[in-house]
A protein has these predicted regions:
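Residue-level signature of the cytosolic catalytic core of signaling kinases
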Residues: 396, 565-568
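Acidic, proline-/serine-/threonine-rich low-complexity intrinsically disordered repeat tracts
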Residues: 550-566
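Active-site anion-handling motifs in enzyme catalytic cores
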Residues: 2-547, 553-555, 572-580
């Protein structure tokens, strides 16, 4: 049965925007990180390129303008920008949020108040006037001096107000695990909402771990958007449970192409990938693993030794996360541990972190992919390369299992704790058998899904008349990875593993938030004592709107806050701990 899409959210023809020049579109993705992340860069670049080629003048939101200018394209000065389709990208720095849950919640509340004042029907407020708002006064010390933070907020809001559209490009960070990234996107969407700039959300994974507060932030963001696509069935179900219009699609980087395979990262002295890339084995298994125990490293080495003996696939270790200025950071640490356990007769190649353009070239040349990361599976499945995904937690299972499921390969995921007993070897053999007889029909079908979604997005942004929503997502049969009853046993173990990991993840999120608010309460109490000798009339929080930001304790399956506890009441952490233990 095909997945049901929501009804068209396209503007009626009478409301469609019309532009005398290329519309300015802000694309939000996790680019500009000094610790380079191949998948994050690839998703953003693919989205930006499609929009630019389709007629938009693209601005990329980045964590570091110089970094993105070096690895994506030359930065353009805003005043000198041509605002033409196909012109070099402009860049807008992120409004960065603190990591701690309490601090990011306070920051979003303050930014919301600044936006309200900026868009009120009166004279534009000054920095001094905005700085004395109670919500701004309550900002965490990491954002002091307040005047500088307010100026940055105003600049950020003004930049978004100047856009014709905002596209939140794909990613897996809309959850409490990466809550500061969720809030950074929420801030951009709220700025667009206040300025009546249309928002579009593409290729997202939602959750799976979300505190009730973070879930509310995400829900508002998605309801603001005119169009939402998600990249796995579980994310679609999350939207449907809340009555949010969404469509199932594929990852934004599914059709990523290397614009310049010779483009390299800026490495520390003495590090180079050139020779290793020139001397890759003729037949190899591409390995990307970001975490494993010592026992699992030994088991993975035995699996790779077996693949060399049985199939002639030499392991090529390809990092997807790492700092090019620190050759020992990121995935390569795990790769070195696994490679050290290989048999002396198994040839191995360890590559440093590569530019996304070079990474996709390595992936497409592989005979097999073994990965615990998401985008190696995406790139390989899209290229018809057999994949076995190794799953360390529910977060990875939801994403990589969801991606492979769209190709009918959802059974080819295995918890890292099940590497013993010959199961991985059986799954490798099954993946190779399927790849030998599989046609490219499903891959072509999914590429057409992405092409149609992008055409729909462009039609809405460009205002080319009323558009019908894309056709329902095509269904597919899942390919067995193991004979029965072994397949059923592995499925049951995978489900139990996922449930256990989800529970642990939710408990961590609640504990992290409780500890964060406890520290914030102590800070505010100390501040109140320092300036007034005791509590203010508004309690520990002062007048910054504590009603919206106090921590709550909830049941693990609850979707709404339970009773609000007064922050001054002692024993908050003890009560949370008792709830988690129960």
């Amino acid at each position: 049965m095909a997945e049901n899409n929501h009804s068209s959210t396209a503007l009626p023809a009478t409301e469609a925007p019309h532009f005398n020049e290329a519309p300015r579109v802000l694309v939000i993705g996790d680019i500009g990180q000094h610790t380079y992340h191949v998948g994050d860069e690839a998703m953003t670049i693919a989205s930006a390129q499609a929009l630019s080629e389709g007629g938009a003048a693209v601005t990329l939101m980045t964590r570091d303008v110089d970094h993105s200018a070096r690895y994506i394209g030359a930065a353009v000065n805003h005043e000198a920008a041509q605002h033409e389709a196909g012109a070099p990208y402009e860049y807008l720095p992120f409004l960065l949020f603190p990591w701690a849950p309490a601090e990011r919640e306070l920051t979003l509340a303050a930014f919301e108040c600044v936006l309200t004042e900026l868009h009120a029907d009166r004279e534009h407020p000054s920095t001094a006037e905005l700085s004395v708002l109670p919500q701004v006064q309550a900002l965490p010390e990491v954002l002091h001096p307040l005047a500088q933070t307010v100026e940055r907020m105003v600049e950020f809001a003004d930049a978004i107000a100047a856009m014709d559209a905002v596209v939140v490009s794909g990613g897996g960070n809309l959850n409490s695990r990466y809550g500061w990234l969720l809030y950074e996107r929420a801030a951009a969407v709220r700025a667009a909402e206040h300025a009546s700039v249309p928002v579009y959300v593409t290729g997202q994974s939602l959750g799976p771990v979300l505190s009730p507060e973070d879930a509310q932030v995400l829900e508002r963001m998605l309801r603001t958007a005119r169009s939402v696509t998600v990249r796995e069935h579980s994310s679609l179900a999350w939207c449907r449970e809340r009555g949010i219009d969404a469509r199932l699609s594929v990852d934004d980087a599914t059709d990523y192409l290397a614009a310049s395979p010779a483009r390299t990262l800026h490495y520390a002295e003495g590090v180079s990938a050139g020779q290793a890339l020139d001397e890759l084995p003729e037949r190899y298994v591409c390995v990307t693993v970001n975490e494993c125990t010592e026992q699992q490293a030994q088991q993975l080495a035995r699996l790779l030794d077996n693949m060399w003996r049985e199939h002639g696939y030499a392991p090529v270790f390809l990092s997807h996360f790492g700092d090019p200025q620190n050759p020992e950071s990121g995935d390569i640490q795990v790769h070195q541990r696994i490679a050290a356990q290989l048999s002396a007769s198994t040839p191995a190649t360890l590559l440093p972190i590569l530019h996304a353009d070079q990474s996709i070239t390595v992936h497409c040349g592989a005979a097999f992919t073994l990965t615990s990361r998401y985008h190696p599976a995406v790139f390989s499945a899209a290229a018809g390369i057999p994949v076995l995904a190794l799953v360390p937690d529910a977060f990875t299972q939801m994403r990589v299992g969801g991606a492979l499921n769209l190709y009918g390969l959802g059974e080819f995921t295995l918890p890292l704790g099940m590497l013993a007993g010959g199961v991985p070897e059986l799954m490798v053999a099954a993946a190779l058998r399927h790849a030998a007889v599989a046609s490219d029909a499903r891959r072509t079908e999914l590429l057409e899904v992405l092409r149609t979604e992008r055409a729909y997005l462009l039609a809405q942004i460009l205002g080319s008349g009323k558009c019908a929503a894309p056709a329902p997502f095509p269904a597919v049969e899942q390919v067995p990875a193991l004979p029965e009853p072994l397949g059923a046993t592995v499925r049951a173990a995978r489900e139990l593993f996922t449930e256990t990991s989800l529970t642990a993840g939710f408990e961590w999120a609640m504990s992290d938030r409780a500890h964060s608010w406890d520290a914030e309460h102590r800070r505010q109490l100390e501040r109140a004592r320092a300036i007034g000798g005791g509590y203010s009339a508004h309690g520990i929080h002062g007048a910054h709107g504590a009603e919206q930001t106090r921590p709550v304790t909830v049941e693990a399956d609850s979707e709404s806050p339970a009773e609000v506890h007064h922050p001054a009441r002692p024993g908050l952490l003890a009560r949370v701990a008792r709830r988690l233990r129960s």
